[in-house]
Design a protein with these regions (language model features):
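Conserved alpha/beta-hydrolase
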Residues: 25-44
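Short beta-strand/loop motif that positions the catalytic acidic residue
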Residues: 183, 189-191
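Catalytic active-site module of serine/aspartate enzymes centered on a nucleophile-bearing elbow/loop
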Residues: 213-249
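Conserved alpha/beta-hydrolase "acid-adjacent" motif
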Residues: 196-202
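Active-site glycine-rich loops that stabilize anionic/oxyanionic intermediates
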Residues: 10-13, 75, 193-194
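Flexible "cap/lid" loop of the alpha/beta hydrolase fold
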Residues: 89-124, 163-170
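Gly/Ala-rich beta-loop-alpha elbow adjacent to hydrolase catalytic centers
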Residues: 72-77, 81
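Active-site loop/oxyanion-hole signature of alpha/beta-hydrolase fold enzymes
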Residues: 39-69
Length: 249
């Protein structure tokens, strides 16, 4: 039976991000889990929750499964997945437009702007930060129709300011919270060619850190699990998994 799949969503989101993306994996026989990160479900609060909290929850879920899973993370969830991968045995690790770990510098002006703009909110690391439609439209949902963007944004929830600070301002973090240790699982990193918030040049650095295969999806942007072309991205993941399994047989 194929290995189970655990899907990890990014900032401001929930497991619903993968409603379509999970379908090809289920059709291939995988049991798929797409949990909400801590505080992201109904009635939850993300204030004060850090990246290590998210990662420990995901690692615990992975270790509780009957066999090592395929762990797939998108955006900030890609960084959560990297951290979890150092604490749980995995069949494979797949990162979709991942936030980079500690030590990987951004390669675009947009990355720098997103990191510094949060300081306009004051001590944002103590708060849960509300999603911003203009930013979501510009950086994440830019290839979707207005109706699709509005529908996705309506489901977004506040994100932990602490987790955002640890992710976007890692060079100011004396605890090196998002430093990723050795990952033994085979890894694949995908980047959207039009992504400006986690562009290919940044994602490639992450892949090099992991010794991972790296692929650019030329026509895609940041919302890989749900924007046009998501099905091709899922197929690429499944093809890579199949080739890995065949090589190991």
């Amino acid at each position: 039976m194929p290995a189970p799949v655990v899907l990890v969503h990014g900032a401001f989101c929930g497991g619903w991000v993968f409603e379509r993306f999970r379908e090809p994996f289920e059709a291939a026989g995988h049991v798929v889990l797409s949990p909400d990160l801590r505080g992201h479900g109904p009635g939850g609060s993300t204030a004060g929750v850090g990246m290590r909290d998210y990662a420990s929850d995901v690692a615990a879920l992975c270790k509780a499964l009957p066999e090592p899973p395929i762990l797939i993370g998108h955006s900030m969830g890609g960084l959560v997945a990297q951290l979890a991968a150092t604490h749980a045995p995995l069949h494979a690790l797949i990162l979709l437009a991942p936030s980079p770990p500690w030590g990987v510098s951004g390669s675009s002006m947009e990355e720098a702007v997103s990191a510094m703009s949060l300081y306009a909110l004051g001590p944002f690391w103590l708060q849960a930060i509300d999603p911003d439609y203009a930013l979501a439209k510009r950086f994440s949902l830019d290839r979707m129709t207005r109706e699709e963007r509005r529908a996705v944004f309506a489901r977004m929830v506040p994100e932990s300011g602490l987790a955002l600070w640890q992710t976007l301002n890692w060079w100011l973090d004396p605890f090196m919270t998002t430093s990723v240790g050795r990952v033994s699982a085979p890894a694949l990193v995908l980047a959207g060619g039009k992504d400006v918030i986690h562009p290919p040049a940044t994602a490639r650095q992450t892949a090099q850190r992991l010794g991972a295969r790296f692929e650019t999806l030329p026509g895609m942007s940041h919302w890989i699990p749900g924007e046009p072309g998501w099905d091709e991205a899922a197929a690429l993941c499944l093809d890579w998994l199949a080739s890995r399994d065949q090589a190991a047989a």
